[in-house]
Amino acid sequence: MAKDSPSPLGASPKKPGCSSPAAAVLENQRRELEKLRAELEAERAGWRAERRRFAARERQLREEAERERRQLADRLRSKWEAQRSRELRQLQEEMQREREAEIRQLLRWKEAEQRQLQQLLHRERDGVVRQARELQRQLAEELVNRGHCSRPGASEVSAAQCRCRLQEVLAQLRWQTDGEQAARIRYLQAALEVERQLFLKYILAHFRGHPALSGSPDPQAVHSLEEPLPQTSSGSCHAPKPACQLGSLDSLSAEVGVRSRSLGLVSSACSSSPDGLLSTHASSLDCFAPACSRSLDSTRSLPKASKSEERPSSPDTSTPGSRRLSPPPSPLPPPPPPSAHRKLSNPRGGEGSESQPCEVLTPSPPGLGHHELIKLNWLLAKALWVLARRCYTLQEENKQLRRAGCPYQADEKVKRLKVKRAELTGLARRLADRARELQETNLRAVSAPIPGESCAGLELCQVFARQRARDLSEQASAPLAKDKQIEELRQECHLLQARVASGPCSDLHTGRGGPCTQWLNVRDLDRLQRESQREVLRLQRQLMLQQGNGGAWPEAGGQSATCEEVRRQMLALERELDQRRRECQELGTQAAPARRRGEEAETQLQAALLKNAWLAEENGRLQAKTDWVRKVEAENSEVRGHLGRACQERDASGLIAEQLLQQAARGQDRQQQLQRDPQKALCDLHPSWKEIQALQCRPGHPPEQPWETSQMPESQVKGSRRPKFHARPEDYAVSQPNRDIQEKREASLEESPVALGESASVPQVSETVPASQPLSKKTSSQSNSSSEGSMWATVPSSPTLDRDTASEVDDLEPDSVSLALEMGGSAAPAAPKLKIFMAQYNYNPFEGPNDHPEGELPLTAGDYIYIFGDMDEDGFYEGELDDGRRGLVPSNFVEQIPDSYIPGCLPAKSPDLGPSQLPAGQDEALEEDSLLSGKAQGMVDRGLCQMVRVGSKTEVATEILDTKTEACQLGLLQSMGKQGLSRPLLGTKGVLRMAPMQLHLQNVTATSANITWVYSSHRHPHVVYLDDREHALTPAGVSCYTFQGLCPGTHYRVRVEVRLPWDLLQVYWGTMSSTVTFDTLLAGPPYPPLEVLVERHASPGVLVVSWLPVTIDSAGSSNGVQVTGYAVYADGLKVCEVADATAGSTVLEFSQLQVPLTWQKVSVRTMSLCGESLDSVPAQIPEDFFMCHRWPETPPFSYTCGDPSTYRVTFPVCPQKLSLAPPSAKASPHNPGSCGEPQAKFLEAFFEEPPRRQSPVSNLGSEGECPSSGAGSQAQELAEAWEGCRKDLLFQKSPQNHRPPSVSDQPGEKENCYQHMGTSKSPAPGFIHLRTECGPRKEPCQEKAALERVLRQKQDAQGFTPPQLGASQQYASDFHNVLKEEQEALCLDLRGTERREERREPEPHSRQGQALGVKRGCQLHEPSSALCPAPSAKVIKMPRGGPQQLGTGANTPARVFVALSDYNPLVMSANLKAAEEELVFQKRQLLRVWGSQDTHDFYLSECNRQVGNIPGRLVAEMEVGTEQTDRRWRSPAQGHLPSVAHLEDFQGLTIPQGSSLVLQGNSKRLPLWTPKIMIAALDYDPGDGQMGGQGKGRLALRAGDVVMVYGPMDDQGFYYGELGGHRGLVPAHLLDHMSLHGH
C-alpha cells in the first residue's frame, strides 16, 4: 500500500509518464488559486484604501460640523451675554433712578418738616422774648419806683447804693444765663453735625453701592461732645466792678431777646430727644440751668445715628437763630461787663431818661454819720430782701406761664418726630434690603438662575434666559441634527467594519493589530462579486474538462483523491464567495440610507447657508436704505438752507427794488420839474416867433418832408406810452383813416401819372424815380393820410424797405435831398407849418354821418389841437391832441388861435414848446441831448440802421443815409427845437432810447437760432445775453448773431444790450437793452439733402437722381434724429426710397414717373425714425428726356369752342436751381432773342415781395428804365433774394408759408410779360402752365367786339400811357380793367349767400395794395382768343394729364377740395327742390370731387360717405398729389393740411411751386398774402367786462408778444393771427410790424 501511495508531485514512482498530466493540472490549479488569492489581496487593499479615504472624509466632515457648531454656539453665547449685560445695565440704571428719587423725596419731606418746626419754634421764641421783656420791664419799674431810693425821706447815698446793688445782681444773673446758654448751644450744634455726618455716611454706604466714607466725623464736633459742660454756678463768673459805667435797660432787654432766641434753639434741639423729658422752656432767669442740664442728659443718651435730626436751615434765613449750623466754633468769649449796658427808661420818663447823667449812681459824698449809715444799710437790706422775694415770685409765675402754654404742643411735636424717625428708619432699612436683593439678582443672573426666586428682576432674567435658550435650541437644531446623522453614519461604519473583520480572511490581518476599520465601497464590492462569479464559472469549466479527461485515462485512487480535495476547496471558495456576496448586498442596502441621510444633511446645511446669506443681504439693504434716508435728510437740510438764502436774497432784492422805485420817483419828479420849467420860458419865445415864421417860408425843401421825418418816431414813442386798450369798436378810431376819403384819393391816384409806389430795393428808387417830378397838394395830403393810417400798426420793415413812405423815399433821392444838402452846405431846411387850434364844440365821430369814423379824433370844447399842414379837399385837418392821439379833425368844429396868443393860451399839459430856462451851458447841453436823441430815434425809424443786404448799390444808399440824411435831420431838429415844438413832434421825450429794437429770432432749429435787431447807433458794440448770462459781444455795426449748441425743446431768454463808452454812461440814456424769448424746436425732422441733380442715364428711359447727403454726426443723426435713408419725390409723389443714410444717388425709370407731363421736378427728402424732412431744392428733369418719348405737345395758349375747356397761362418762375446767368439763356430756342429784357423784368416782378401798405397804384414809370445790359445782374440779385426768401419761408414751418412769390401787380409789367408770352412758339422749361376752369361764356365774337369798343373809349380818355408800351400792352391793360368790372357784376349774385362772411371780405381798393400776378377773373390769351368770365371759385394748378384726361364721368380721377365755409343746403341753397341732392359740409373739411363743374356751378363730390353736389363757390381745390396718412389728408410737398387755420381769412391758400394755387370764391381781384410777424405794443384783454359778448374768438395780448398775422385787416380793424398755438382775431391798432427776414 505504501508503494501505491501517490508521490507529493502527483506522479507514481513506477509510472512517471502517467502522473505527469495530473501534476500539470494540479500545478495549474495551484497557480490559479495563488492568482485568486493575489486578486483578493489586491481587492482587500483597495477596500482598505477606500475605508481610509471614507474615514478621512468622515473625520473632515465631523471636524467641520464641530467647528461650525462651536462658532454658532460662541456667536449665540456672545449675543446672549451682550443682551444680558445690556438688560442688567438697564435694570441697574432703573433701580438707581428709583433709589435716587426716593432719597430726594425723603430729603424733601425732612426739609418740609424742619421748616414747619422752625417756624413754630420762631413763634414760640418770639412769645417768650416778649414775656421776658415784659417781666424785665415790670421788675425794673418795681425796683426803681418801690425801692427805698424812691422814698422822700431816703438819702441819695442809699438810693445810689441800691441802684448799684440792683445792677450788680442783674449783671450777675445775665452772665450766668449767657454762659450757660452758649455752652449748651455749642454742645447741641456739635451733636447735630455728628448726626448729620453719620446719616450721610449711612446713606452713601447703603444706597450707592460704594464702600463707606472713610474718615471720622469732624474732630472739633467730637471734641465738643466730649468736653465737659461749663459750670453753671454763680461762683465761676466774676462779679463786675462797680466802678464801670452802667448801661441802660434797653440794651439789657436786647440781650434778653438774644438769649431767648438762643433758648428757642436749645428747646428745639432738646425736643428731639427720644424720652421727651424736656416739656417746657425756661421762663425765668433762674430756671435756665436745670432745663439745660436735663436737655444735656437727654442728648447724651441719644444714639449717634438718628434719621430724625433737624437739617440745617436754608442759608437765606435772616434770623440769627435760623442760620446754617456749622462745626462748633471756639467757646464764646466772656460777656461784656455790665457797664456796657444801657439803662432802661421808665415808662413815664420815655426816652428822656436816657439822656440823664449818671450822677445818681455815683457814691454819696463822705459826710454822713454812723446812724445814718446803719439806717441806710438797713434800708438797702430790706429792699434787697423785697427784691429777692419779687424775683422769686416772678420766676414762679414765669414757670407757670411756660408750663401752661407749651407742654402739650411740645409733647406732640416730640411724638411726631419719633414717628417720623421710625418711618425714615424703616424706609432706609427697606432700601438697604432692596439694594442687597438687586446685588443678589445680578449675581444669580451672571451665574445660574435660582428657581423659586420671586423677585421681579429674577423673573425677568428667567424669561430672557428661557427665550434665549429657545432661540439657541432652534438655531442649533440643524447642527445637532447633522451631528446625529454623522453619529449614525459612524455607528453604521463600525458595524460594517465589525462584519468585515469577522469574515474568513480576518486571520490574515491578525498580526497587523486586530480587525480592519476601513470603509467598503459598494461599487468595488459589486465588481468583486462579478469577478468572483466569473472565476467560479471558469473553475467549473476547468473541472468539467478535467473530469472529462480523467474518464479517458484510467487513473489510480490518488487521482480521485486529488480531485476530491480540489472539489472541496472549490466548494469552500464558492461558499466564501456567496458569503461575501451577501455581505456586499447588505452593505449596499445599508449604504443607500446613509447616503440619503448625508445628502439631506448637506441640503439642510446649504439651506442654512442660504438663509444666512439672505439675512446678510437684508441687513445690507436696510443699511443702504438707512444711509439713503440720512442722505435725503442732509439734502433736505441743504435745500432748507438754500431756501433760506434765497428768501434772504429775495428780501434784499425787494429792498433794492424799493430803492430803485424811489429813485425812479425822484427821476420822475425831476422830469416833471424839467417839463414845468420850459412852460415858464414861453414868454421868452415870443420875440423869436416872427423869425421862426420867416424860416418856415424859406424855399428849397418841401414842407411835408420834415413832418413825415418826425412822424414815424412819434408813432413809436406814443406806441410805448399808450394805455392799455380794450377791444371796443371805439378803440379803433386811432388806427383807421376815413374810408371814403381814402377811396377818393386812390381813385385820383389811379389817374395820376406820378408814380408813388416804390420798388423793393433802394437802387431802383434812385434810378427810376424822376428827380424833377413835383408833388401836388392832393398827393402830399394823400401820402400823409396813408402813412398816418398805418402808423399805429406798422413800422418800416428794415430788410426790404417795402413800406417806406413817399416822403422817406424822397429823402433817398439824390436830386431832392442829398443834392440840396451838398449845395446848401450846413443850411437848415425849412420847418413845417405848425398851427394850434381850439375845439369850439363837442364832437363824437361815431355819431357823425361819416361811414368810417375810426380815423377821426373825438373833440371836447376847449381842447387844444396841434394841426400839421393844410386842410384837405374834404374839409379835414391832420391833427394831434395834447394826450398824443392823432387823426382827422373836421374844420368846422375848430378855430385857429392867432400866433400872438399862443404863449399865453397853451394848457399846463401841453407838450414842451421851447427850451428850459437853465443856467448858461446847461440849456445848450440839454438841447444837444434832445437833438441827439431825436437824431438817433429818427435814424432808427427811417431804417438807417437796417441790416445791409448784398449789393453795391445798397451799400451806396446806406452810406448816403449815414452821411447826408443825418445832417438833414440834425438841422431839422435844431430848427424845430428853436421854434419850440413839442418833444413828441421832435421824436423824443428827453430820454434817448439806446436799446436795440425789433429783436427777431429766425431760423430757429433744435440746436441753433439766429437773432437780428435794429440798433440805435452803429457806432457802439452790443452784448448778447442768453438766460441772463453774457454769451457774446458783437462789434459795432453788426446787428445779428447766431446761437449754436442749444438744447432741443428748451425755453431761452435772449437780451441784447448796447455797450456805451465810459464818458457816455454819465448821461441818463433810459433803456439800454431789449429782451425776447423763444423755444427751440424738438429734435427732428432731419435736414433735407442738398444739390439735387437730375441727369439722363446712358440707357434710354432712365434718369439718374443724385444729391449731397445730409451731414450726420457719429451716431448717424441729423437734427437730433436717426437718418434711415432718402425718399425721391416727383411733383410731390413718392416714386422710390433708398434705405441708406449715406446714399447719394439712385436711378428712376420712365415707368415710375406720372405720364404724360410736359416737365416734372424731382425733390429728395431725408427719411428718419421721426418722419421725413422737408423737400429739398427741386431739380428739373431734362427737357429732352420727355421729347424722346414723343409727348403730346400743347400750345401755350389753346382754346376749344366746344365744352368748357382749360385755359393755361405760361409765365416764368424761378426754380431753386436757377443759375446766376440771365433767364433768357434758359429759354427755349423758339423764343426770340429780344425777349431777354422783358423776361428779366418779369422775373424781377415775380420775385418781388408783396406790395407795401402804401398805395394800390402801380409804378408805371419803373418799367423800361433799366437798360438791357443790366438785366443779367438784376436777375442774379433777384435770384439770390429769392433764395433767401425761400429759406425764410421754410423756416416759418407753416403750410401757408410754402408758396411761390406772387407776381407784381404792376400793369405795365404784366402786359409786357403777356405780350412776350404770346410770341413764344413752345413752352420754355422755366415756365409754369396754369389753367382756369371757366363756366358759361359769351360767344367769342360778341365778347371781342364789345371789349374792343370799351377799350377804344378808355384809350381815347387816357393819355398817360408811356410811349415805350406797345399797342398790345395798352390793349391788355384796358382789357384787364374791363374784366375787373365784369367780374364785379358777376359776383353780385353770389353775395347773397355770403352775407355772414361779408364782414371779413376786404373792400376793393383796400389799404393793402397787394394783388395776384395771375388775375382772379380769367387769364389772358392771344389777342385772337376768346375771353371768358371766371366763375366764383377758381383753381390754378398744373394739369397732370392734359386736356384729354379731363372728363365729366365718374371714371375721372378724384380730386381733393377743401371747404371754405360751412354749408347747409336746407338753409342756404338757392334751389330748395335740388337741396336734397346737395351735401352738407363744414369749413376746412376735405372733399373728394369727380369731374368739373356743371352748368349750375356745382361739383359731384363725396363727403361723409355720401355722394352729392357741392357749390363750387364755397370750395377750393388742393393739389392732386395728396395722400391720406393717419386718417388725415396730407400733402407731400407741405405736410399735413392746416386743421386750425381759418382759410377764409387767408384770402387764398398758398401752396409750393409745382402745385395748385388755391383761391377763395370771390370774383374780385384779391391779394395772395404772406404771413407777417408783428409785435404787440400794448396789453389787450378781450375778456374784460367792458367787452360784453364781443370778445369771443379774440386773442389776449401782452406788450411784446410776437403774433403771426395771416391775411389783411378786415373792416372792423382786426387781423387774423396766431399766438402761442391759439388763433383768433387781433386788433390791428395794437400791433407793430417786425422784420421778418434779414441777412
Curated annotation (Swiss-Prot):
Record-level GO BP terms: fertilization; spermatid development
The organism's place on the tree of life at top rank: Eukaryota
Stretches assigned to coiled coil: 21-143, 409-442, 480-619
Keyword vocabulary terms for this entry: Coiled coil, Cytoplasm, Cytoskeleton, Differentiation, Repeat, SH3 domain, Spermatogenesis
PROSITE patterns (alphabetical): FN3, SH3
Compositional bias ranges of the Polar residues kind: 707-718, 761-775, 1293-1305
Residue intervals of the SH3 domain: 832-899, 1452-1520, 1569-1636
This protein's record includes keyword Repeat: yes
GO molecular function, one term: benzodiazepine receptor binding
Residue span(s) of domain Fibronectin type-III: 995-1083, 1088-1184
Name of protein: RIMS-binding protein 3B
